[in-house]
Amino acid sequence: MSAPLTLALSKGRIFEETVPLLAAAGVTVAEDPETSRKLILPTTDPNLRVIVVRATDVPTYVEYGAADFGVAGKDVLLEHGGGGLYQPIDLNIARCRMSVAVPAGFDYANAVRQGARLRVATKYVETAREHFAAKGVHVDLIKLYGSMELAPLVGLADAIVDLVSSGGTLKANNLVEVEEIMPISSRLVVNQAALKLKRAALKPFLDAFERASLGSGA
């Protein structure tokens, strides 16, 4: 009997919104990662198991073949670079946007017009660098791993680049969204070698995910 396929998922919104896609393929994950201590979760399909990893690590597990396929946000994939990955499907889940935000009262447009050099805090350094370079905005990028909203409040940065969903966290911290960089959603990523060697085993899942994603994007 061949080894089961391995699907890499991260906890939280991506996991929660992938569950219905798995259900469309007739598969249920046996345990909830929010309550289970296990990092390898069986499913109702003996040919599929789920590993629970950090969102930023999903592309790495898939690239190196530790997982055959996974679900990762466009934001994570842009920072990773996408090497060694096949990205067949935009799943239309975990949708939000990547934006620039500043403290309320800070005249961002004028600062840009004046050619000011801005300090920008973000975990998305590569994407932010490309965005500001394309607009001719001079920035010093400060890499942080969380609590972006704090950086402008304590004088660490003039602005942040972060993911925005409802905007509630920005508002609660007296920040305003001044520029949308791009819409973000999560994508299915597949190890390129697995796609060749395990195509028959992967195909039912890829087909089910594609059908379900078309429905969720409607």
Swiss-Prot record:
InterPro entries: ATP_PRibTrfase_cat, ATP_PRibTrfase_CS, ATP_PRibTrfase_HisG, ATP_PRibTrfase_HisG_short. One of its GO terms (cellular component) is cytoplasm. Pathway: Amino-acid biosynthesis; L-histidine biosynthesis; L-histidine from 5-phospho-alpha-D-ribose 1-diphosphate: step 1/9. One of its GO terms (biological process) is L-histidine biosynthetic process. It is found in: Cytoplasm. It catalyses: 1-(5-phospho-beta-D-ribosyl)-ATP + diphosphate = 5-phospho-alpha-D-ribose 1-diphosphate + ATP. Belongs to the ATP phosphoribosyltransferase family. Short subfamily. GO terms for molecular function: ATP binding; ATP phosphoribosyltransferase activity. It is an enzyme of class 2 (transferase). Its EC number is 2.4.2.17. Pfam families: HisG. Lacks the C-terminal regulatory region which is replaced by HisZ. Keywords: Amino-acid biosynthesis, ATP-binding, Cytoplasm, Glycosyltransferase, Histidine biosynthesis, Nucleotide-binding, Transferase. It comes from the Bacteria. This is ATP phosphoribosyltransferase. Catalyzes the condensation of ATP and 5-phosphoribose 1-diphosphate to form N'-(5'-phosphoribosyl)-ATP (PR-ATP). Has a crucial role in the pathway because the rate of histidine biosynthesis seems to be controlled primarily by regulation of HisG enzymatic activity. Heteromultimer composed of HisG and HisZ subunits.
